[in-house]
Amino acid sequence: CGADCHNSCAKTAEMIADSVLADIRKPYDEKMTLMKNIALPKRYELWEKLGILPGGAKDEIFNAVVKTSTNLNSDPMDMLLQCLRLGISTGNYGLILTNLMNDIIMGPPQISMDPVGFRIIDPEYINIMITGHQQSMFADLEEKLESEIVQKSAELVGAKGIRIVGCTCVGQDYQARSGCYKDVYCGHAGNNYTSEAVLMTGCVDLVVSEFNCTIPGIEPICEQLDIKMLCLDDVAKKANAQLLPYTAEEKEKITS
């Protein structure tokens, strides 16, 4: 594939991203246009018939927060309908569409036989535990860790190298594409409910979080075991973590 193909793919990706963002940011009384393309036709017809097709996802979330605030909405049927609109928008955009875009960016998942659980953590390595939902935000980190210079630096301080330890949902994303990351990704250690136990092994040297599924219970453990914490998004900001807001333009600086 030549430069023209690359530019065309990049432009297509940009158009898709802009379309998704435009849909999500619409007001609640404007229906999201991509919904018809990604939802099952019969379900879409039913949602349309019932009048529960959601407007812009962010506005729907805002309305839900306001409705559940003190002394506001008290109609259970209205709130149930609000929940249905939230479920439709987040299920189709937050799950289906997000996964489709991840497949475009990083390739589709592949079925493989791989070890999981605490046994994948080797204490002889410098281990970076990742938590969150957005695998693409770790792409530059992963690329840097694969370099011989970085791995040699780890060896200079007595480690065998540096590895990424998968935890929470982003760990499952890595596991689904494990064939692409065998050099630095050692496997999926556990979900968000076992992330505290993963840290208690004493084999983790750094926690990098980028979004949700980063539970508050890891804070005292990291403090007690002197495990450094970095957050790439203030949504998952922990009290004792350093915040490094991620932007595509500054990804190399952040990784360094």
Which residues fall in each region the model found?
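Metallocofactor- and cofactor-centric catalytic cores in central/energy metabolism, strongly enriched
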Residues: 1-256
